[in-house]
């Protein structure tokens, strides 16, 4: 299914974000997310040998700080023309927990961008029963 204009805009914004910073091992992925009220939030990962947040998690924090509410779609773009990157397992779990209705833009089997529900990417996510 073709991307909507809003979804295509997310790819453009994340690409512009990662291309706006110098090539670096410390900041190699940008993410953009769309809120239900139409705002777009961007961010980049912060690599450090002790660990660090992925770009998607940085965007979640930025959106939360702006009282964005529900996020409806998210994408990650790698530097050096790597294009769309699928969320890692940790990000999939966090997205499922915090925004269970969110879609992530990933590449389909033909390498084309497509937006899929987070539950499709993580059908058997961890459920804490505390």
From Swiss-Prot:
Binding residues annotated for Zn(2+), in chain numbering: 54, 88, 91
Disulphide bonds in the chain: none
EC number: 3.5.4.23
Variant or mutagenesis effect after changing residue 56 to Q: Loss of activity
MF terms (GO), sorted A to Z: blasticidin-S deaminase activity; cytidine deaminase activity; identical protein binding; zinc ion binding
Record keywords, A-Z: Antibiotic resistance, Hydrolase, Metal-binding, Zinc
Occurrences of domain CMP/dCMP-type deaminase (ranges): 1-129
Gene Ontology process terms (BP): cytidine deamination; response to antibiotic
Binding locations of substrate: 28, 82, 126, 128
EC class name: hydrolase
Phenotypic consequence of residue 56 to D: Loss of activity
Subunit record text: Homotetramer.
Family: Belongs to the cytidine and deoxycytidylate deaminase family.
PANTHER family: CYTIDINE DEAMINASE
Its job: Catalyzes the deamination of the cytosine moiety of the antibiotics blasticidin S, cytomycin and acetylblasticidin S.
Name of the featured protein: Blasticidin-S deaminase
Organism: Aspergillus terreus
Gene of this entry: bsd
């Amino acid at each position: 299914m073709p991307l909507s204009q809003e979804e295509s805009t997310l790819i453009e914004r994340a690409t512009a974000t990662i291309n706006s910073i110098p090539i670096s091992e410390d900041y190699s992925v940008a993410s953009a997310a769309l809120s239900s009220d139409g705002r777009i939030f961007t961010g980049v990962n912060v690599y450090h040998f002790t660990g660090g947040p992925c770009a998607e998690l940085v965007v979640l924090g930025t959106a939360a700080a702006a009282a964005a509410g529900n996020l409806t779609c998210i994408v990650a773009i790698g530097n050096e023309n790597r294009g769309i990157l699928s969320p890692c397992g940790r990000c999939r779990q966090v997205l499922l927990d915090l925004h269970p209705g969110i879609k992530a833009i990933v590449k389909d089997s033909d390498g084309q961008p497509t937006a899929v529900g987070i539950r499709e990417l993580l059908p058997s996510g961890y459920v804490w029963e505390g």
